[in-house]
UniProtKB/Swiss-Prot annotation:
GO terms for molecular function: folic acid binding; vitamin transmembrane transporter activity. The chain crosses the membrane at residues 55-75, 78-98, 101-119, 136-156, 164-184, 313-333, 361-381, 392-412. It is found in: Membrane. Belongs to the reduced folate carrier (RFC) transporter (TC 2.A.48) family. One of its GO terms (cellular component) is plasma membrane. Glycans are attached at residues 35, 254. Keywords: Folate-binding, Glycoprotein, Membrane, Transmembrane, Transmembrane helix, Transport. Gene3D superfamilies: MFS general substrate transporter like domains. This is Folate-like transporter 3. It is a multi-pass membrane protein. GO terms for biological process: transmembrane transport.
Length: 424
């Protein structure tokens, strides 16, 4: 199959697997239709996603290359399929806990989606491949959430109808994952060797190689890349921010619907609007940020500090507000700020780090973020059993701590810069 046919197929898979119209109304369905209490959902159901994602991430990361991508993509599709089979036919708390387990597996295996295309296209097409595969995800989400809003907002369908549409979509995703071309290990081995400038007579090496040679090269590169990444202080700093920021971001998207659910049910008919607007606003925000001619190595700490303070204010406002429109607006702005700062971090790292190391860096940072989120969940939800509005006050305080940390780093840099100028 030609590389552009593969590109179209993987992008179609990406859009279909993200076509999940149930998501803006998951809490409403579980709370109002299944009659599961807010406390049970917060303390016994939703935390399982965090723990499942954490446990599944490292095996997924390692096995993606070892099993040559496609099997992991199939596991991702099957995990999403299992989620919505449970949504359609499950009714108990135990079923919802099992759903969160599969949801964690599906999220963890998403890494194969981005890794697969890099083995299938030439290196010079990596940039366009990344753009297309990411755009496919955004398109799938936007269409799903827009459809959900129309169906629920206009009373054309109920939550179970959304579940059935979702199940059909995930069934199609399984089919697409199954028909994706497999990746011969020799192709993957050749891709890795192409990045080594010292390698000569590439065709001979590949033709004489064994699968064990491919595995050996993978683990040797893994060790070397870990050292390369974390010996750079700039990469380490942005990695710390990425882990801290992603930790609280995952927590917010996991529990925002619970906060919306504290308002009368009729006001939650519009949950699809903010979820649809986030990817729609995220694309131009991402493009504008990438075009900005700013030295983020110098001003990045200040931006992170200001952005975290703004996010702290938004979360605190959400914790106090009983107006759904305020909650929606704060949520959208919060997500866009996260998108902007993440784009800046990626752009900065792109100037510092070999693009081949991004996947490894993302995997490690995500693992650290999930470990931190697990600790946060254990303290705020499992131990203290805080109500949802009190939780958002804590999350606001978390952002203030992050803002203070990076504000201090920026302050130290500014003082040193001024001192050096005066010394000269």
């Amino acid at each position: 199959m030609g590389q552009w046919k593969v590109m179209i197929l993987i992008c179609l898979y990406g859009a279909v697997k993200e076509f999940r119209p149930t998501e803006p109304y998951m809490y409403e369905y579980q709370h109002t239709v299944l009659n599961i209490s807010e406390h049970t959902l917060n303390s016994e159901v939703y935390p399982i996603w965090t723990y499942s994602y954490l446990v599944a991430l490292i095996p997924s990361f390692l096995l993606t290359d070892v099993l040559l991508y496609k099997p992991i993509l199939i596991i991702e599709a099957l995990s999403y399929f299992a989620c919505w089979m449970i949504f359609v036919f499950g009714r108990s708390v135990w079923c919802m806990q099992l759903l969160e387990l599969f949801y964690g597996w599906a999220t963890a295996t998403e890494i194969a989606y981005f890794a697969y295309i890099y083995v299938k296209v030439p290196k010079e097409d990596y940039k366009s491949a990344t753009a297309y595969t990411r755009a496919a995800l955004l398109v799938g989400r936007f269409l799903a959430y827009t459809l959900a809003q129309l169906l629920i907002g206009l009373n054309w369908a109920d939550y179970m109808t959304l579940n059935i549409i979702n199940l059909v979509s995930m069934t199609f995703a399984v089919f697409l994952a199954a028909i994706l071309p497999h990746v011969p290990w020799r192709n993957a081995y050749q891709k890795k060797l192409e990045d080594k400038k010292s390698v000569t007579d590439l065709e001979s090496l590949v033709s004489e190689a064994k699968y064990s040679d491919y595995l050996k090269l993978f683990f040797v590169e893994l060790h070397q890349n870990l050292y390369t990444i974390y010996k750079n202080p700039l990469v380490l700093k942005w990695s710390i921010w990425s882990a801290l920021s992603s930790c609280i971001f995952y927590q917010i998207i996991n529990y925002t619907q619970t906060l919306w659910g504290t308002l009368p049910e009729k006001e939650n008919k519009y949950n699809g609007i903010p979820e649809a607007l986030v990817p729609l606003l995220g694309i131009p925000a991402d493009l504008i940020t990438r075009q900005m001619n700013v030295n983020w190595n110098r001003w990045g700490d200040a931006l992170i500090s200001v952005g975290s303070l703004l996010q702290a204010g938004l979360l605190f406002w959400m914790s106090q507000s009983h107006e759904i429109i305020i909650l929606y607006i704060c949520y959208i702005i919060y997500r866009v700020i996260y998108q902007l700062t993440t784009t800046i971090a990626q752009s900065t790292l792109a100037l510092t780090l070999d693009s081949r190391l991004f996947g490894l860096l993302f995997g490690i940072n995500t693992f650290v973020a999930l470990a931190l989120q697990s600790i946060l969940t254990a303290i705020v939800i499992d131990a203290e059993k805080l109500a949802i509005r009190a939780q958002f006050v804590v999350y606001s305080g978390y952002h203030i701590v992050v803002a203070t940390l990076f504000g201090i780093i920026f302050g130290i840099w500014a003082i040193r810069t001024i001192w050096r100028k005066r010394s000269h």
